[in-house]
């Protein structure tokens, strides 16, 4: 038997629900890769005979393999920063007050409208490199900092180009309904018409999006407007997701679940009826501990209810310049545990198996199983819990992407 590569002297956190051990763990394990897929995984003692002279053999030095990390919610492509707003918040201004005074998302929109594609690409590349160094092999990138046809398309084109020129896979989400631009301040319905009738068709014509998102909140879009955008996305054949229940309980999550959303994100104010709706529809709940931390929120997502109703919990960075300027997947694992009280295993599942489900790619990534794409990381750790327990020590020693060893 011949394989493209074999890993030995390793432990594997498969994250597969088919294995009853915590983390789906296999200790004293081995893993084989062929044609970019996982060809064999199990105990090293059970490893079939193979051509040891013709097969590259890698030793994990007693560390751990996990699936490649998946950051399922980012706003990675933007220009400028909002450090001034950081100072304002520390002096007592609320996120909502800043947004209503013309700051917040709109200030980043203005910077993105002025930036060209080359500038946005380079900024995005640097941020994607930072995530990749921490073991991220797939990332979702949203638009939403254009709020006009030209800039929304520009951001999505840059996201697609990043995916073509980086080993990290990029899934794109059209978030034209992120905020109401100043020019539509007194006619938000007209802006929704623009998103549906002009922006979305152009996005589809260039194949720039895998999904559509909306910010459903009292400072952004109401339930009726949100449903209009999501329904148009469904009619166009795209997946849907939603920023919901971040600042108040508007019922957006239940509505999105009814429409078959892949995920609802933030959900600090989600109630039991909303959780039940997610459970019944198979919609994921995406937790964004970076925003919770940075905005110094006190309303916690309903973790116990999500467990009770067995809703898949996703952990993501929400990397953005206003509410989560924290470009670190590993920091999110730690915060998910320390701030939101997930277990380390739940947090890691939230950035592997469940994150893949939220992006609709769980048929080929998110767990270590035979037949899945060979996307995995090798960590210099003694237990998978270390990924959430400690922070600041680089422990990702190797990454395999599509069966190819990536030099970090």
Curated annotation (Swiss-Prot):
Keyword Cytoplasm among UniProt keywords: yes
Q: Which keywords does this chain's UniProt record carry?
A: Cytoplasm, Histidine metabolism, Hydrolase, Iron, Metal-binding, Zinc
Residues bound to N-formimidoyl-L-glutamate: 145, 320, 322
Q: Which residues bind 4-imidazolone-5-propanoate?
A: 82, 145, 178, 246, 323
Enzyme Commission number, as recorded: 3.5.2.7
Q: In which pathway does it act?
A: Amino-acid degradation; L-histidine degradation into L-glutamate; N-formimidoyl-L-glutamate from L-histidine: step 3/3
Binding-site residues, Zn(2+): 73, 75, 243, 318
Q: Which reaction does it catalyse?
A: 4-imidazolone-5-propanoate + H2O = N-formimidoyl-L-glutamate
UniProt record, GO biological process: L-histidine catabolic process to glutamate and formamide; L-histidine catabolic process to glutamate and formate
GO terms assigned for molecular function: imidazolonepropionase activity; iron ion binding; zinc ion binding
Question: Which cofactors does it use?
Answer: Zn(2+); Fe(3+)
According to the record, cofactor stoichiometry and binding are noted as: Binds 1 zinc or iron ion per subunit.
Q: What class of enzyme is it?
A: hydrolase
Q: One Pfam family, short name please?
A: Amidohydro_1
Q: Which GO terms describe its cellular component?
A: cytoplasm
Instruction: Give the signal peptide as a residue range, or say none if absent.
Output: none
Which SUPFAM superfamilies does the record cross-reference, listed alphabetically?
Answer: Composite domain of metallo-dependent hydrolases, Metallo-dependent hydrolases
* Subcellular location(s) per record: Cytoplasm
For this protein, the record's Gene3D superfamilies field holds: Metal-dependent hydrolases (3.20.20.140), Urease, subunit C, domain 1 (2.30.40.10)
Specify where it is mainly localized: cytoplasm
Q: Which residues bind Fe(3+)?
A: 73, 75, 243, 318
Q: What does this protein do?
A: Catalyzes the hydrolytic cleavage of the carbon-nitrogen bond in imidazolone-5-propanoate to yield N-formimidoyl-L-glutamate. It is the third step in the universal histidine degradation pathway.
Protein name, UniProt field: Imidazolonepropionase
What is the source species? Shewanella halifaxensis (strain HAW-EB4)
Ranked from the top, the taxonomy reads: Bacteria, Pseudomonadati, Pseudomonadota, Gammaproteobacteria, Alteromonadales
State which gene encodes it.
hutI
